Amino acid sequence: MSSNEYAIVVENVSKCYQIYDNPRDRLKQFIVPKFEAALNRERRNFYNEFWALKDVNFEVKKGEAAGIIGRNGSGKSTLLQIITGTLTPTTGTIATHGRIAALLELGSGFNPEFTGRENIYLNGAVLGLNKNEIDNKFDAIAGFADIGTHLEQPVKTYSSGMMVRLAFAVQVQLEPDILIVDEALAVGDALFQKRCFRQIEKLTSNGVTLLFVSHDQESVRTLTNRSLLLDRGKQVMTGLSSEVLLEYRRLLHDEENKFYSNLASEIAEKTQNEKNIATDNELPIVSITSSENEESTANENLRSDKLSFGEGEA
């Protein structure tokens, strides 16, 4: 597989997290296995494994616009973090060719104590640009962000919308080879999102590789050619975005049906339990009616005796 052809290559990538029930188990995991190894005993683990990704394979050609879709918790953000190098995979390999600009979690890559201006230079330096190169691009970045005098204020004072404006402006104006965009754009207003999408289309037409993640199916269909569908950390499908989106809709439909089916079962079970409780608490109506009849008969007999006694005296 030639490095001249592909910008991103993901091979058999898996990511496992160790989940501990309590802090003591974490301490046991740190100490006990060492003693067991020294004594040639079978090693025990004091954690549960959670596989955020399992055997994912995915390639993106240079200049291609690719998407990653899936429900919340499917592993999309984990995969992006592995591609950008902020996470290491448990197994598998990642290869990237070119300078990466990534817009991931809101505020990632920014120092909250620095001003917007200072963060522009910080991010430029991280991408390998010198001060003169950043100076030449500064006006374009400030103009696209369009946050006015807030550029001279600490980023920690920014609203989420202002932060994503500056973050996107920095990433797209610094001319990356690979642009990775997560769902952070969702916090921007509709007008700014349109500006972002136009800029993304401009970059991809100029040969920039795009890796785009969004729940907005129309944006994925418009901006990308191929997509990867993830579900519960597993690779479901890779192919044309239009075909992958159809599979994604089917998956959502199946999950929705499953949810409402379970909900209906829970409601039916709850209703039946309430009926059973009501039946158990009912008073013995038959016994009460019988007692009332006996009392009524006794009263009639008493009145009859009184009448008979009166007639005898006369």
What are these regions (language model features)?
Residues 69-71:
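The feature captures the beta-strand-to-loop junction immediately N-terminal to the Walker
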Residues 90-98, 235:
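ABC nucleotide-binding domain "signature motif"
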Residues 131-156:
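Conserved ABC nucleotide-binding domain
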Residues 202, 223-229, 236-314:
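Localized sequence-composition bias
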Residues 215-222:
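Conserved H-loop
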